Every structure is written in structure tokens, then in C-alpha cells.
Amino acid sequence: MKIVILGGTGLIGRALEDKFSSEHEVECRDRSAFSSLEELLPHLKGSDLVIQLSGSIIAKRWTKKHLREVWSSRVDANNMLAKAISLLPNKPRVICASAVGYYPESDCENPLQEIDNEPGNGYLAKLSVAWEDAAKSISSDVIILRFGVVLSRKGGALKQLYLPYFCGFGGPIKD
């Protein structure tokens, strides 16, 4: 099986490559694959599965410029992926990332249920809705995974949280 991981140089993409590469042909591409349709299309040809994880890091200062980059690297990338896949004679299965930012805020007394499918109101919710709408335009059976904060010893948020907790500045972790 040929698996193409878009956003494959990130934390999750590298972990998936490690997992799948012993039994499958895996091609990992960074966001530069979305520089043009002509750049993206050759990577998708002959693929059985496309995992779309690409997107600019959110954990930076939220300037207008950065928020436009975050939006474009997700929504515009999924729109380009939809266009590219529509041009393929054999359509691969597609898995797309999204974020738990889709959901509205909730508390422990009124926990949110997956069946409560109404999005929140903030920037991340609006981004997630547009991101998922673009993903749904790829295929009627696209799989959308809503990720939260990913913790790993290999990078990501855990690496940034470690020092404050180690120094005693982290708050309690509880329900």
C-alpha cells in the first residue's frame, strides 16, 4: 500500500511514518508540497491512502499575519488537495486532521458529548469548521480526526511544558 503523509515532517507525521514504513511504501511531504497543484499532484499519483496533517504551527503569537497563515495552511491546503484528487484516475482514501478547537467550551458539570455537534464561536472553532468543510469536499467518505494537544517526549507541547512543571510552576492536573 502506498501511503502519502502530507505534513509528514511534523510530530504526528513522523510517528506515523515510523509506524507504517516497515510494511508499506510511505512518502512524507512537508507544506511545500502545497506550493502549487503541479507540485502536489505527482506525490498523490498511485497512492492508496493520503493522510493530510499539514498546517502551520498554532502555538505562536496570534498576529493577523500568523492567523492568515494558519488558515491558509489548513483550509486552502485542503481545497488544493480536493482539486488534486479530483484529477486522479484512481482516488485514494483520505484522512484529514482537524482540531478539538471545533467544540464549544464546557465544564466538568456539563461535559460535552460527541453527539453535541455544534461548533464553538471563537477563531479555532471557525477555523475547524472551514477546515473540515474543505476536507469534506475531497471525498464523501473522508475521515476527519479532531486532535487536541499532542504530548510526546519527541517534541510538541510536552517539551515546552516540562521546564515550568519541573521548576514547580505547573498547576495541578485533575478532572
Enumerate the predicted regions with their spans.
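NAD(P)H-binding glycine-rich loop region in Rossmannoid oxidoreductase-like domains
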Residues: 34-80
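Conserved Rossmann-fold NAD(P)-dependent oxidoreductase catalytic core, especially the SDR/UDP-sugar
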Residues: 79-120
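Conserved glycine-rich Rossmann-like NAD(P)H-binding loop of the short-chain dehydrogenase/reductase
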Residues: 25-32
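Catalytic loop of short-chain dehydrogenase/reductase
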Residues: 109-126, 161-162, 166-171
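Active-site Tyr-X1-5-Lys
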Residues: 119-142
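NAD(P)-dependent short-chain dehydrogenase/reductase
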Residues: 141-144, 148-175
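SDR active-site strand-loop-helix element
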Residues: 6, 53-54, 94-100, 145-147
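N-terminal Rossmann NAD(P)H-binding glycine-rich loop of SDR-like oxidoreductase domains
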Residues: 3-21
